[in-house]
Amino acid sequence: MTDASNVCSNPDCRVAQLGTCHLDHDPVDSCPHYGSREAADLDPGEIEELSAPVERTMDGIELRSNKVIPESGITNFRNRVRAKTIVLAGEQKTGKTTLLAALYGMFCKGPVGEFEFVSSQTLYSFAERKHLALFDPERSVPVTPRTSRGDDVNFFHIKMKAGDNLSEIVISDRSGEAFEDARLDTALVAKLSELALADRVCFLLDAARLTKKETRPGYSRIFKQAIRSLLDNDAVPKSAVLEVLVTKFDRVSDGQDGLNPLQDLEQYEQELRDEFGASGYEFEIHRICVDFH
C-alpha cells in the first residue's frame, strides 16, 4: 500500500491506510495537500539534460562512452596516456574514414604485422564505422559515411603490443573539406589544430584518381599543393614523420592505349621523394588497399 507521505504533505493524514481524507475532503484529490509532496519531489528537468551523457556512472564507477575523443578532450587524454599521435590528412573521398574502419577490422581478425590488439578507449566508434562500411551487402566496394565539414576533429585510440612492448596511438579524423579549404586559403591552416600534436602526418594519395588520364594533371598538382600549404606555414612539427599513403591501389587498372598507370604512379612517387624528402622531414611512401573480407 502507498505510504501517505508519498501522496500527502499533511503528516497526520492516513489516506493511504483508510482511503479517506483527514480534513474530510471528498473526493480526496480535492484536498490541497493531496499529491503535493509527490509533485514537489518530481524533477521537471530540461530537454538538454535528457540527452545521453558522454560518461555514465554505475554503482559509483564512472564508465567511458568508448566513443571518439573530441578535440576538447585530447590534451587531457595525452597527459594521462603516453600515445603517439597520427594525423590523417587528405581531401574529400581519399579514404580516411574507410582506412580507420579497415584498421579496426584487421585487428578483429588478428595481429596486424607484428602488432596485436590490446584495447581501445574508442571501441564503440571503431565498431560503428566498420558496421556502416559493411551495412549494404549489395555494394561491391566498402563505403563509409564521410566526416562532415561541420564536425570538429576527433581522435581514435588503439593500445597494442609487439612482443612484450606495449604502445598506444591516437589517430585524427577530420573532414576532407577542411584540408581543401586550408589549401585554398592558408589562413585556415592554423585551424588544423591536430597538426601541432603530430608524431606522424599521413597524406592520403588517391591512386585511382592519379592514374586516370582525365584527372591526373589537376590531381597531381593539387596533392603537392596540399602538402606544401602545411609545410610552408610551419603547421607540422619538425620532429614529425611525413608519410604518403597511396590508397585505392587495388583500383589501378592495367595499361591500355599505350598508358602505363603503374609506371605513372612510380614516377609520381619519385617526384614526391625528390621534392619533400629534402624538406628537412623524414619522408616515407607506402601503398595500401582496404580489405573488409
Segments from the language model and where they lie:
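Amphipathic helical hotspot of TIR/SEFIR-family domains
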Residues: K213-V236
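Flexible phosphate/Mg2+-sensing switch loops adjacent to catalytic phosphate-binding sites
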Residues: F107-S148
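Long, basic/Gly/Ser/Thr-rich N-terminal segments
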Residues: M1-E62
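Pre-Walker A adenine-sensing motif
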Residues: N66-N79
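Glycine-rich phosphate-binding P-loop
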Residues: K84-K109
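Switch II (G3) loop of P-loop NTPases
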Residues: D164-V189
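Canonical P-loop GTPase G-domain recognition
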Residues: E243, F249-H293
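Inter-motif core of Ras-like GTPase G domains
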Residues: R183-K213
